[in-house]
């Protein structure tokens, strides 16, 4: 059974204040002015983990209230450009603003470094999202995502087999890292097995049925065995498929649904496709993009993505017009780091 979070959405202006609540979830300290709401006036959303932490509830509640009223800015980091602040310094230099969400990656077994940067971003008041590029042994880099493949999906997904034990041992690497963030009361938008339907990463090469089993195994392992109550589960489609329903494991394993695309514009057709799967039960995010859609494009396309996250390095520095970037980050519809509620306040 899912934990209920109510989001009562206003028609024109959504005010987040210390006294405002979403169900039993405190919304925020800072008032944020947003524009016309295209969502329903009252929507019931649910957290999949019945025992989710207070911090996860608060973050999820904020995202639910934002959905349909504004878009949260996000940026994926790189760590090989001379500074782990490369993209963030660039955005601030060009716009005077920082993104609200920092995207991180446990790739190359960088659990310690990612956790340190996640904790720092959280202390700055930001939102943390983590993905995991890895091979089928849950180690390595982006290349291993593409080049490796499970030898026998049936054995790997059958409890008690040596292959299953190996799968679980690999999966547990990130669980241990996420426990360290849990100890610090840091909620995480956890985005595993992204671009799940694309066919290029090992986790999608076994087909939809095997993928769904894999997702459920991780969800159960992390939620029920490791008691990771700080995770908000983000289910991320690619933009290259329209047969989305067959990959969907069920509402009880997902908190936020989304897709990515490196095509210009609001990608409203992609949004509509994902919206059908969401069926009004959860927010929808643009979990990766190249060129950020303008606010005009989002409004005209009625694409109510709750956040965007630009990919790293040249995707932000070369792929986005500086004037557009400045306009986007300074538009009242776009939430930046300085406009987030105080998620780090003493509970």
State each model region's role.
Residues 30-105, 295-297, 345:
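N-terminal module-boundary/linker segments of secreted carbohydrate-active enzymes
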Residues 244-265, 309-311:
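Aromatic- and acid-rich polysaccharide-binding/catalytic face
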């Amino acid at each position: 059974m899912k934990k209920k979070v109510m989001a009562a959405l206003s028609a024109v202006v959504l005010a987040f204040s210390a006294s405002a609540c979403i169900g039993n979830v405190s919304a925020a300290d800072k008032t944020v002015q947003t524009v016309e709401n295209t969502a329903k006036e009252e929507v019931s959303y649910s957290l999949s983990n019945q025992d989710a932490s207070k911090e996860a509830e608060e973050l999820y509640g904020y995202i639910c209230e934002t959905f349909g009223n504004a878009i949260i800015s996000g940026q994926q980091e790189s760590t090989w450009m001379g500074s782990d602040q490369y993209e963030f310094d660039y955005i601030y230099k060009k716009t005077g603003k920082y993104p609200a969400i920092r995207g991180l990656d446990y790739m190359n077994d960088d659990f310690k470094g990612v956790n340190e940067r996640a904790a720092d971003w959280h202390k700055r008041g930001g939102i943390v999202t983590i993905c995991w590029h890895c091979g089928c042994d849950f180690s390595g880099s982006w290349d291993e995502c593409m080049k490796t493949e499970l030898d026998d999906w049936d054995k790997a997904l059958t409890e008690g087999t040596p292959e299953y034990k190996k799968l679980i041992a690999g999966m547990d690497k990130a669980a241990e890292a996420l426990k360290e963030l849990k100890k610090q009361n840091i909620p995480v938008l956890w985005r595993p097995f992204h671009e799940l339907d694309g066919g290029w990463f090992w986790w999608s090469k076994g087909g939809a049925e095997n993928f769904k089993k894999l997702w459920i195994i991780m969800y159960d392992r992390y939620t029920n065995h490791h008691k990771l109550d700080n995770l908000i589960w983000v289910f991320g489609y690619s933009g290259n498929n329209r047969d989305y329903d067959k990959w969907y494991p069920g509402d009880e394993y997902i908190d936020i649904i989304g897709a990515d695309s490196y095509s210009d514009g609001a990608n409203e057709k992609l949004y509509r496709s994902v919206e059908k799967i969401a069926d009004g039960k959860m927010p929808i995010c643009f979990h990766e993009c190249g060129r950020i859609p303008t606010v005009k494009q989002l409004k005209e396309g009625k694409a109510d993505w709750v956040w965007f996250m630009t990919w790293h390095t040249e995707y932000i520095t070369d792929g986005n017009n500086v004037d557009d970037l400045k306009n986007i980050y300074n538009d009242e519809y776009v939430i930046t780091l300085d406009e987030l509620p105080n998620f780090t306040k003493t509970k």
